[in-house]
Amino acid sequence: MMRKKEKVITMTVTLILVVILICIKVTHFVIIERPLKQCRIVSAYHLTVDTNGAQIDQSWLFEKDDLTYIDIAKTFEQTYFVTDYAGGSGDSGALNELTIAFGETMDGMPDIRITVSENGYIQINGKRACPLSLKYAGNRLYGHLLECLQDGADRQQ
């Protein structure tokens, strides 16, 4: 009798854990992955800053209606991990950053803004993203973002 009761408790706990894991996966997909993939990219620019954080150059890659996921994915692929140090006397050079803004709120601000520096430093902020600043494994983030962007490109065709 006691063994049967233990078995029922074990099965119940296992079932509850499985349901929780499924809920977490569904929530992750619905809240995090899907909205990002379905967001329209509203702006992207390539920024070069010196080691003190001063802006050297900023070139807009795309703005508003001219954006396509294919173009931004190609540009991201070409500009990220490119060592393009601006020569400076006695200076260690400059870092390239690529900023991509997804979506747009009523006040014209992007829902999510992701800035990737060539040294692997990532900043994510915006109304639909928790403010986040981290040193990330650059290749993994680059791959994940490119997949999201290419997935959006497939939907646009």
Language-model regions: role of each:
Residues 2-157:
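Function-determining sites in protein domains
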